[in-house]
Amino acid sequence: MSARPGLLARAEARLTREWQRRGALAWALTPFACAFGAIAALRRAAYARGWKARVDCGVPVVVVGNVTVGGTGKTPTVIALVDALRAAGFTPGVVSRGYGAKIVAPTAVTPASAPQQAGDEPLLIARRTLAPVWVCPDRVAAVRALKAAHPEVDVVVSDDGLQHYRLARAVEIVVFDHRLGGNGFLLPAGPLREPLSRRRDATLVNDPYSRALPPWPDTFALSLAPGDAWHLARPSRRKPLAQFAGERVLAAAGIGAPERFFATLRAAGVTPATRALPDHYAFATNPFVDDHFDAILITEKDAVKLGTSWRDARIWVVPVEAALDPRLIALVVEKLRGRTSA
């Protein structure tokens, strides 16, 4: 049984379901999708043909993004990629748009930054990797500011920004979840920002159901595994997920694909009631105050907006680790080193 989600979350879930099939709504929206596709194609062509100039910031950029709307697992992928690049001998930094943050100029994000000023994903990345992280809607400005502040950085990972064509990049990685391209239609008739045929260097598929990978070139499985939960008010307290099995548990997530979080918990032996909150939910007030559960499990991305000052002793945070295929890491490293030696 699921706890009742908010109106906005239900509307998002309904639209997501519609995007998985070619129903009446999808077909009715195809004229708008055609217009969207034409505009997007013109933007891509403008940079591909040199009508508009790409900006090389003097440091190779690896873009981790998606061609679909909604969460696919980019943030844990960025964290894992930063760790892998560091292990390969690079000194990585990260740039992001800082969704929801009040930013107009390039801004550094540290583990102590406020989520309202940094954005939840950049703050989580800064805390998990301790790498230099800068945010700005203008990715070029963000990369330049990061490089000026940290000249030792020799590769920049862009958290999203696939459609920010102005920024020159050395590697593009597109991340999908189990829904892949949905009904195959462009926005607003479907979930696609760009056609599935869009060129990229590698594809990651984050499918908790472990189905066969699509037959695309350089496609790799992305595995997300949960770690022990930690207590929001007392982070030093740890608890294996299996120990929640006999408790009344609510799982809540304000991320792009909350069902993926719920599926991860079920696979670990937890059978929670579920609440899908709107993506980037602000947690201005405690949405759990009237809920009667022994424990409430939330994502790390949501936890950065709460802090340890929240007095709800039922809240536990479930961290997620991404396991990257060694062949993907080798592909990225080869392209980066080839660019450096060119």
From Swiss-Prot:
SUPFAM superfamilies attached to this UniProt entry: P-loop containing nucleoside triphosphate hydrolases (SSF52540)
InterPro entries: LpxK, P-loop_NTPase
Pathway where it operates: Glycolipid biosynthesis; lipid IV(A) biosynthesis; lipid IV(A) from (3R)-3-hydroxytetradecanoyl-[acyl-carrier-protein] and UDP-N-acetyl-alpha-D-glucosamine: step 6/6
A Pfam match: LpxK
Coiled coil stretches, renumbered: none
GO molecular function per UniProt: ATP binding; tetraacyldisaccharide 4'-kinase activity
GO cellular component, one term: plasma membrane
Gene Ontology biological process terms, A to Z: lipid A biosynthetic process; lipopolysaccharide core region biosynthetic process
Function, in words: Transfers the gamma-phosphate of ATP to the 4'-position of a tetraacyldisaccharide 1-phosphate intermediate (termed DS-1-P) to form tetraacyldisaccharide 1,4'-bis-phosphate (lipid IVA).
Family that this chain belongs to: Belongs to the LpxK family.
Protein name: Tetraacyldisaccharide 4'-kinase
Encoding gene (name): lpxK
